[in-house]
């Protein structure tokens, strides 16, 4: 909640306002994906003799869809395989008993990714391409969030700004900023990212990787004099910065957290109006204005019989001529000169029968060592945004507060988000959004049981508020660790894992691999340095691994 940009010194803030914006330009792989995407020459060139060649794309999440879309534009024929539904962790659902899916004004719940930072300019490129609109997401203490309640150890505090909270929260904010400046050259790295100063980015980051690769997030805090107080560390873990508490990330590598704060990945979030799953679905149907080989009006859907992707992949193996042979759930067997795997990488260890020859042994080790975060959510539809009603005291006098607020707590629910669709219109509450151990607490319970526990927990914070009477449909819930094609919400490296992540990330540079280990490319969340907000970048790199660039450097040269 104590977001870093609100805590910089005044002179730094003034300087930042006048400087170029922060984007996800690094720090691990400083490359201007936004400029690359905007180049009129496109992303690369495929020889005419290769036009129409089929390329398997396994996984229909955003990375897979972007990969297929860009391959199609160069004249190749992507063949998409998807085990469940297009969208991956961009999963938007409707509620039973409410307006039907596709109906104007239908209530939706974002079961996966639901908020995106402006700094993810490659992601925004495709949002704009798909004609989608965004709106501010109601994070704790965000400018467009009406109010926030922090409930810790039975003490409840109401706030519209940070200044409304007790002084200890400001102390925690200052401690976090001091920790970043002293231990991670925060302002220096942000300045380099704004200026896209590649030598300076590499200088700072290389030093930090050497120093901090074996350090946990919690250890980084403990090493800082600013966080010598356990109480400050405890509050920081429960309340955090940007989107809320971060104690579930305490065991992870501090390098993961630095990527988030350096690049503004947790700041100024926006949600997609109508749901994030529209993005991959619209790209599936989108007809590019400029394509090679294919006639005008060609889309990914048009290249697939019945407009549907092929089913789940059940086997991957290499065959003569260094081809990749794919078997799907119907028993159909097809062989390709190249394939791109964008699904959750543990699928290669469990759901899909794979040859060891698909990857070098060190890459298999990196896949096996991938670490995933558990995550659970539950949403309910309500009749209207009743939380904006003025609260009253025992005498019926207005208190000056909202009836209910975006809520951060150390209770079972942890994070509660209020999603407003306008005055007197049906709305949605995310009763609980949890991670890791907090998520596992919900795993044995079904949606109804979860809702009952959540309503009881929130009733202890808001004893005068009857949430139940406003609910107009059945709850929807997800535990990503229990989803058979995901087994977790997203990748988060543990200390010492930098070498594994670099190995997977640079896999697209296949001229470095033995000749008999080429042709199968890795992409997606698990391969990117960061989470869902950057899979378009990994898809672009994979696409560049297949194409030749007309005299301008693509992602490949940067990997050196």
Specify the residue positions occupied by each region the protein language model found.
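Glycine-rich FAD pyrophosphate-binding loop
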Residues: 72-98
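Mobile amphipathic helical/loop "lid" adjacent to a hydrophobic cofactor/ligand pocket
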Residues: 7-10, 15, 24-26, 128-129, ...
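Active-site/ligand-binding neighborhood in enzyme catalytic cores
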Residues: 195-312, 319-321, 345-347, 352
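Flavin (primarily FAD) binding-site architecture
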Residues: 338-362
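Core beta-strand elements of the Rossmann-like FAD/NAD(P) dinucleotide-binding domain
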Residues: 51-53, 329-338
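Conserved beta-strand-loop-beta-strand element in the redox core of flavoprotein oxidoreductases
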Residues: 310-334
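N-terminal Rossmann-like FAD-binding beta1-loop-alpha1 element of flavoenzymes
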Residues: 50-80
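Conserved flavin/dinucleotide-binding core of flavoenzymes
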Residues: 2-42, 323, 381, 388-560
